[in-house]
Amino acid sequence: MATRGHLGGLSLATSESIRLLDALGSPWILVETVGVGQVEVEIAGKADTTVVVVNPGWGDAVQANKAGLMEVADVFVINKSDRKGAAETQRDLEQMLDLSDLDESSWRPPIVQTTATTSSGISGLWDAVLAHREFATASGELTRRRGVRLREELREIVERRLEDKARQLCTGERWDGLQSDVLAHRTDPWSAADEMLKGIGG
């Protein structure tokens, strides 16, 4: 789904699509973002398990932390692990995990090395995903995440409908008249906005 007009890694229709597939009984739903960076970490708010895929030579541990991926990853994957730098990338990730504030009861994201072209490590990746699901279910983290996700989805729906209502209000003779009043200094923008908002409850 295109992300045009949305400042994030996921399109606005992602939540609805996930909910639809879930209602149809899909046992697993995979969502891929448009890249890896700060705007893509919002996937953590939509997924039960977040898998962060990096390549060898991806960058030092400081950059990994700045991207926010250390905070959202449930599983790390080093793809193209047959290339030079895979061991160094794993070491950087391990060091960042060691320096994080994870306690003994927290989930420690495993680091799995894969090579997609040969399917190497894929079974290990799937085992890591299943292990996280088991942990999240037993610890109550899965229920908590889904509750947070539902609240966020409801907020997004309300915001979207309010935006649609605002677009409807900001047209017509009344809008033009208030705009003229502001330009003529007969009122201020805040008072004009309050006047327009009187109709938003309809």
Residue ranges and their predicted role:
Residues 14, 32, 69, 79, ...:
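Residue-level signature of catalytic and energy-coupling elements of molecular machines
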Residues 15, 19-22, 44, 48, ...:
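Signal for well-folded cores of large energy- and translation-related assemblies
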